[in-house]
Regions:
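Short, structured active-site "lid" loops
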Residues: 132, 138-143
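Serine-esterase "nucleophile elbow" of acetyl-processing enzymes
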Residues: 56-125, 129
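Hydrophobic anchor at the start of a short beta-strand
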Residues: 105-107, 138, 212-215
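Surface-exposed cleft-lining segments at the edges of enzyme active sites
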Residues: 82-87, 112, 179-197
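N-terminal secretory targeting modules
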Residues: 1-76, 134-135, 149-188, 204, ...
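Short, solvent-exposed loop/turn segments at secondary-structure junctions
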Residues: 83-85, 113-117, 145-149, 219-224
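Conserved, well-ordered alpha-helix/loop/beta-strand core segments that scaffold catalytic motifs
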Residues: 142-143, 197-240
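Well-ordered, non-membrane alpha-helical segments in soluble/globular domains
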Residues: 121-125, 190-203
């Protein structure tokens, strides 16, 4: 399975569309933090050892209920990266799936593996524009990914759409050789701090003005280095 996914955006897009296919993964190495995990558990006794994990996606390429299901059902809405997508997990073991089942809600999980914070902002804009008027979510969760993931877009003229790709600090060759990333994230991290300051405020305010409860979480990999004095909430590290 390909977990660092390119997303596309067209003039008539209702959501970012993920370039992915349904498939089966039996490689435990795809699990986030697998090398650290295997030091702590007995793989011979672990439930997931040698299991084949199916990945099935909806009409927009997301691993969740169909977006059309919100016409008739209440739902929980989740944004995030591979932690929320459930990379290396059965669908029923993903936290958003468990929450939806516990609360008797549909599971609308817009997590994109390998993505940064910017695609969450883009999808929030699109979702708010195209689906909130149908039915508001009961709850919204933002799982903040690694804060040094940078999303950049290129325009495909022949197909008239934007490709949005994410560069990660883990891939140093691509990351520090990009002039924009080097200038605004490494030599001077002003662009990163700009997103730290404004993106959480925006994501929270969208739902707060609609009276929808919103929760901000991270799995110990988002470091908000520049926080607005007007930010009244914390991004909760649920690993601690």
């Amino acid at each position: 399975m390909k977990f660092n996914m390119v997303t596309t955006l067209k003039e008539d897009s209702k959501l970012l569309r993920i370039d992915t296919e349904d498939g089966i993964d039996n490689c435990m190495g795809s699990i986030p933090n697998y090398n650290e995990l295997k030091k702590q558990i007995d793989l011979n006794k672990w439930y997931y050892t040698d299991k084949k994990i199916p990945y099935v996606h909806n009409e927009y390429g997301y691993r969740c209920d169909t977006i059309d299901s919100i016409y008739e059902n209440d739902y929980i809405l989740t944004f995030g990266c591979s932690y929320s997508y459930g990379e290396g997990l059965f669908y029923e073991d993903v936290y958003s799936t468990k929450l939806a089942k516990k609360l008797d809600l549909k599971n609308i999980n817009l997590a994109i593996p390998g993505s940064g914070i910017s695609p969450q902002v883009y999808n929030t804009i699109l979702f708010n524009n195209n689906f909130n008027k149908i039915r508001l979510p009961k709850y919204v969760i933002y799982q903040y990914p690694n804060d040094y993931r940078v999303s950049l877009s290129t325009y495909e003229e022949t197909r008239n759409h934007l490709d949005i790709d994410t560069f990660t600090a883990g891939d140093i060759k691509e990351y520090d050789q990009n002039g924009y990333i080097f200038d605004y994230y490494l030599e001077n991290d002003g662009e990163k701090k700009l997103k730290d300051l404004l993106f959480p405020l925006y994501l929270n305010n969208v739902w707060e003005t609609l009276n929808v409860p919103v929760f901000h979480i991270t799995f110990s990999d988002y470091n908000q280095e520049f926080k607005s004095k007007y930010q009244s909430f914390e991004i909760l590290d649920i690993v601690d």
